[in-house]
């Protein structure tokens, strides 16, 4: 019989840099999960994506074992990296902080495609373009 899931934990952690300190320790510790085992597995799976923030969804079972699913990096992180800016604009309608090309937009949309609620790449590009607009990043033709 399948194991019963007792908790779903969502965290966004830097790739390859999970450690038992907060937020990982308290989130997993309260469910009795082996924190070091999670940190080692997560760091091993995300070592090739250094510098990115990778969201993770952890399922904790009643016997205290766990499984986790890695998601794609947030669109805002990918847009900031493509535009070469530290952070988005605090007034996106007035001040623009950078710009990305259509090709970069398509690349980001393809990366995000598994996690987006979109049927084709064009719809995914519109979703990512909306995120860019809200960050004060313009899209060049």
From Swiss-Prot:
Signal peptide: none annotated. InterPro entries: Ribosomal_uL11 (IPR000911), Ribosomal_uL11_bac-typ (IPR006519), Ribosomal_uL11_C (IPR020783), Ribosomal_uL11_C_sf (IPR036769), Ribosomal_uL11_CS (IPR020785), Ribosomal_uL11_N (IPR020784), Ribosomal_uL11_N_sf (IPR036796). One or more lysine residues are methylated. PROSITE patterns: RIBOSOMAL_L11 (PS00359). GO terms for molecular function: large ribosomal subunit rRNA binding; structural constituent of ribosome. Belongs to the universal ribosomal protein uL11 family. This is Large ribosomal subunit protein uL11. It comes from Rippkaea orientalis (strain PCC 8801 / RF-1) (Cyanothece sp. (strain PCC 8801)).
């Amino acid at each position: 019989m399948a194991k019963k899931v007792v908790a779903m934990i969502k965290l966004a952690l830097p790739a390859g840099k999970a450690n038992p300190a907060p937020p990982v320790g308290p989130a997993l510790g309260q469910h009795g999960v082996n924190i070091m085992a999670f940190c080692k597995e997560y760091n091993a799976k995300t070592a090739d994506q250094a510098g990115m923030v990778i969201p993770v969804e952890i399922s904790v079972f009643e016997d205290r074992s766990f499984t986790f699913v890695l998601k794609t990096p947030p669109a805002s992180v990918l847009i900031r990296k493509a535009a070469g800016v530290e952070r988005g604009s605090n007034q996106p309608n007035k001040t623009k902080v950078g710009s990305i090309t259509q090709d970069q937009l398509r690349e980001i949309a393809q990366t995000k495609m598994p996690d987006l609620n979109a049927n084709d790449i064009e719809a995914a590009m519109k979703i990512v373009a909306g995120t860019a607009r809200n960050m004060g990043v313009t899209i060049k033709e």
